[in-house]
C-alpha cells in the first residue's frame, strides 16, 4: 500500500530508545535496529528482572518491527516489576502496536494517574480508542493532552485523523493545518494533511504537500493511488470502503 495510506501507528524508530548508552560497544540512537536488538537482548537475558534492560530491549524490538516479541518481553517485565510506570507505558504501546487495543488502553491507564497525567500516554490512549471506533471518547483524551501541552503537533495530528476516520474531512483538515503550521511538525503530520486534502479531491495540492518528504515520483504515485481508491469508492456498489488509514503519532 502506498506511503500516503500507511498503516495506523507507522513503524517506530530508534529515537524511541531513550535509555543512556553505557559504553562504546552499545548502539547509539541512530544505530542499526537489528544491532540494538542483539545488544539490548544480551543485556536483558543476563538479568531478566532488570527494568531498564527490559525497557531498552522491548523498545529495540518495537523499532525492529518485532511487535509480538516486544509485547511478550515487556509483559514479563511488568510482572517482575509491578507498578513500574515506565514499563507499563512501554507495554501498553507495544500492545497497541500489536493490535490489542482494549488491552493496551487498560494497561496505559495504569501507567499514569488522574492527579499526574502524562500527555504522551493520553495521546496514545486516544489512538487506541480511535482504532476501536470510539472517536468521541478518543477526542476527549486528545483534548486532555492538549491542555497539558497546548499546540503539540503530534497530538493535533492524532486529533485530525480522528475526524478523518469519522469522515469529518473539513474539520480534520482544520486541525491538521494547525499541526502543520508548527515548526516541530514532522513528516507524519505533512503526510496526514496531504491525505486529508487528497480525500477531498484536491489532488494537486495534496501532491505539493507530500512531496516535501518524498521523491516526486513517490508523491505522484501516492496521489494516483488515492485517486484510484476514491474512483472505486462508489456508494451504489452496496457498501462504502473505509477511509485509508494514516499514521497516528505515538509519542514516547
Label the model's feature ranges.
Residues 56, 90, 123-124, 158, ...:
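Canonical tetratricopeptide repeat
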Residues 51-52, 85-86, 118-120, 135, ...:
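Helix-start (N-cap) detector for alpha-helical repeat units in TPR-like alpha-solenoids
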Residues 46, 80-81, 111-115, 148, ...:
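Structural marker of alpha-solenoid helical repeat scaffolds
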Residues 2, 7-56, 60-64, 72, ...:
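N-terminal leader/linker segments that initiate helical-solenoid repeat arrays
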Residues 15-19, 183, 187-189, 196-252:
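Terminal, low-structured helical/coil segments at or just beyond the last alpha-helical repeat
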Amino acid at each position: 500500500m502506498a506511503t500516503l495510506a500507511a498503516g495506523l501507528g507507522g513503524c517506530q524508530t530508534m529515537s524511541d530508545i531513550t535509555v543512556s548508552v553505557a559504553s562504546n560497544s552499545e548502539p547509539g540512537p541512530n544505530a542499526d535496529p537489528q544491532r540494538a536488538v542483539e545488544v539490548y537482548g544480551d543485556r536483558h537475558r543476563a538479568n531478566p528482572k532488570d527494568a531498564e534492560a527490559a525497557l531498552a530491549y522491548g523498545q529495540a524490538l518495537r523499532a525492529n518491527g518485532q511487535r509480538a516479541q516486544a509485547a511478550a518481553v515487556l509483559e514479563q517485565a511488568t510482572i517482575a516489576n509491578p507498578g513500574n510506570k515506565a514499563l507499563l507505558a512501554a507495554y501498553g504501546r507495544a500492545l497497541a502496536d500489536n493490535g490489542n487495543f482494549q488491552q493496551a488502553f487498560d494497561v496505559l491507564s495504569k501507567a499514569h494517574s488522574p492527579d499526574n497525567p502524562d500527555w504522551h500516554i493520553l495521546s496514545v490512549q486516544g489512538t487506541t480508542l480511535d482504532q476501536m471506533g470510539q472517536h468521541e471518547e478518543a477526542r476527549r483524551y486528545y483534548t486532555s493532552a492538549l491542555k497539558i501541552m497546548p499546540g503539540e503537533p503530534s497530538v493535533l495530528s492524532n486529533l485530525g485523523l480522528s475526524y478523518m476516520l469519522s469522515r469529518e474531512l473539513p474539520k480534520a483538515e482544520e486541525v491538521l493545518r494547525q499541526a502543520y503550521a508548527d515548526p516541530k511538525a514532522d513528516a507524519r503530520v505533512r503526510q496526514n494533511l496531504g491525505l486529508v486534502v487528497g480525500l477531498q479531491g484536491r489532488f494537486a495540492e495534496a501532491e505539493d504537500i507530500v512531496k516535501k518528504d518524498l521523491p516526486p515520483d513517490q508523491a505522484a504515485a501516492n496521489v494516483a493511488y488515492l485517486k484510484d481508491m476514491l474512483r472505486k469508492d462508489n456508494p451504489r456498489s452496496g457498501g462504502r470502503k473505509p477511509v485509508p488509514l494514516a499514521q497516528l503519532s505515538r509519542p514516547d
